[in-house]
Amino acid sequence: MARPKRGNQVPPPPTEDEWDLRYATKEALAFPEMEKQFPGNCAEAKSRLKVAPTTRTDVQEKLRGSLGTRAIAGSEMDQWQYDIASGARLWYCVDPEKRIVWLTLAAMGHPRSTASKGKRAPRNR
C-alpha cells in the first residue's frame, strides 16, 4: 500500500451517508502505523468518525482553549480528540459543509501541547 499524503482519503471510502475521512497534516500521516498497533480501536474510531464525528463520548471530546479550533484550507474548524488507547490520540477537525473529517494528529503518546504548563505529576517515591 502506498504511503498516504496530505489531502488523501483514509480508506475505506465513505458510503453515501458517511463522512469522508482525510489526512490534513503530516502529523496525521502516522495513522496507518497507529492502525497496525491498535487495529480494533482504530477501526472503531473510523466507524464512529464516519457516522458521528461531533458526538461527545467517553473517548471523543472537543479540545478546549487555543487547541479548540484550527484553520484548514482557509476555514476555521472545531478540533476534536479521540482517545484510541491509553496515551494514543487522534485529533481531527470537522467541516460540516463538505462533510469531511480532517485528521490533524495521530500521536502514540499524549500530545505535549495538551500538557499543563508549569505543572508536573508528583514523582513516585
What are the functions of these language-model segments?
Residues M1-A88, V94-R125:
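Basic, Lys/Arg-enriched alpha-helical interface segments
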